[in-house]
Regions:
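Conserved phosphate-binding/catalytic region of the ribokinase-like
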Residues: 62-65, 87, 92-196
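Ribokinase/PfkB-type carbohydrate-kinase core domain
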Residues: 1-128
Length: 196
């Protein structure tokens, strides 16, 4: 379980975003731990600068739904996406169909992490999936954060979405093999070794 005391996060305001150095082609990774209006300002600035925004909907609240249509890439876990799909009135017989409805409605990419079942992306250009590593989990806290961090870093290093997702899925899996959030984030060398 993760408990969040807003503290410093709650003091990050939209006007603080103006101080960020964001350039064309950069990747801007955001999550919902700062005020929604601040996340919205960062997504807007990324778009204006020609950067790619990645929104992690965690910790999920319904304010994230409006931002999902603005971010270039949204990452949600199964529960978060299902809640968002209901709020957006996305129709479909299963999650993948609802993900396709999201892309049709927004023109944006949606990635849903599926725990031990890996990850699925639906994009305007096609669908991709990546498997999770077969592990014995110790603690799943931080797996989503690790996934998102590795996804953003891998894309920024020039990997395509499918390869970036595979690396991120492996990293997220490895993060579950140790206790704690930050201490469990694996080194890139360990991720690449596990993928070999």
């Amino acid at each position: 379980m993760i408990v969040i005391a807003q503290g410093a996060n709650a003091t990050v305001m939209p006007e603080d975003i103006a101080a960020l150095v964001i350039n064309k082609g950069d990747y801007v990774l955001l999550q919902m731990e700062i005020p929604t209006q601040t996340v919205a300002a960062a997504v807007k600035m990324a778009r204006e600068k020609g950067a790619i925004s990645i929104l992690n909907t965690a910790p999920f609240h319904l304010d994230a739904v409006a931002l999902m249509a603005d971010a270039d890439i949204t990452v949600a876990n199964e529960t978060e996406f299902d809640l968002a799909a209901d709020a957006m009135a996305l129709h479909g017989v299963d999650r993948k169909t609802k993900m396709s409805a999201f892309v049709a409605k927004t023109g944006k990419t949606i990635i849903v992490t599926l725990g031990a079942d890996g990850v699925l992306a639906v994009t305007p250009l096609g669908n991709f999936s990546a498997s999770a590593l077969k592990i014995t989990p110790v603690d799943t806290v931080g797996a989503g954060d690790t996934f998102c961090g590795y996804l953003g870093a891998s894309l920024a290093q020039g990997l395509g979405l499918e390869a970036a997702m595979a690396r991120a899925a492996a990293a997220g899996s490895l993060a579950c093999t140790k206790a704690g959030a930050q201490p469990a984030i694996p080194l890139l060398a360990d991720v690449l070794k596990a993928m070999a």
